[in-house]
Structures are given as C-alpha cells and as structure tokens.
C-alpha cells in the first residue's frame, strides 16, 4: 500500500479542443451529429467534470455512485471509453470488490477491441494493470505491463510500463527485482515527474523492507525536487 500519497486521478479534464471535436463530430455516414445528441454529449461531459471534482474533494464513494448512474444510462457510444476509464479508476480507488472483476474484464475487452482512443491507451493499460493486481491476476498484469514497454515508442510510456513491472514485483514481495527496475528507470529518465513516480514506488519498497531511514530520506528528496508531486493538481 502507498504511504502519504494523496488521491490522484489519472484522468485529466477534457480541454476546449477535445470538446470541439465532440461537438462537431461527423458520423460514419458523413452526417453531423443531431443537435439533441450534441446536447446529450455536452451534458454528460459536464457530469463527468462534476464526478472528477467530487473525487478530487475526497468523496470517492459519492463520485463512484454518480458515475455508475452515468455509465448505466449512457447511450452515446462516443463517450463509452471516457466513462469506462474514469469508472475503472474509481473502482480501484474505492476498492469496490463487487465491481472490480467485471470492470477488469470490460476494460480488457475495450483495449483489445481497439475501442480506446490512442491518446487514452496508456492510461487504460496502466489502470488495467492495477485492476489485474487487485484480483490477483499477476501474470495478466505482467503481460500488460510488458506490453506497455514494448508497444509504446516514447520514453515516458516505457518508463511507466517499467514502473508497473516494479509494482508487480513489489506485489510478489520480490523487493530486489522491484528495486532494480526502479533504479533502471531513475538512471534513464530526465523527466522530473517520472523520476518522482519511480522514487515514490521505491519509497514504498523501502518501507516494506523495514528501511525507514532510507525511506524518509528519499521522501525528503522527492519533496525537495518536485514539491507539486503530492498536490491534488498533479496528473500522472
């Protein structure tokens, strides 16, 4: 389990450009979306913003219940992926045992069926890995973590895939392997936020190994080099 980590959503708010895309979307027949459907999209996006705000305020169960209603009643396929990714994360954050297995399956199908937009694919994979660990499907989690390392070209994605592998080793209590992977990430990256994410995992590993002094020193270094890492505004 993480220590001192403030709840952070993986899902960032849609910006104006994203919304313009939704509003002007042309269907497969070359026809513009009807006005009523546009209004539904706008209303749903506003509701998703409200859910995120509630979650960031620490009211996770309230946010989850509101999102579940949105998900169950959504009729616009264009919004399915956005809703599912946020829903999946809140399932993890609320530790919802009732929904975690079905959500893992649903997200896995969405990814493997290419229903997730490329820009959201990394987020979806990382959430799926956490879902798999939560239901003790370690080999599945490792497969998807390695997939992230293999299929993404950018260094940030590869680093996050390696950090996920370290989390899996940590889950298996193989702290030596977990630490090795984290040190590889730290030695390769020049990105301050990636380094902070990796160091935070190493902090957990140190605590689990009983190395409290080293953990405390590491935390001081994280806060000194990247004080915004634990703020609610930070997006992984």
Predicted feature residues:
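Acidic, polar-rich low-complexity tracts and alpha-helical solenoid repeat scaffolds
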Residues: 6, 15-236
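Sec-dependent signal peptide recognition
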Residues: 1-8
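N-terminal signal peptide c-region/cleavage motif recognized by signal peptidases
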Residues: 11-13
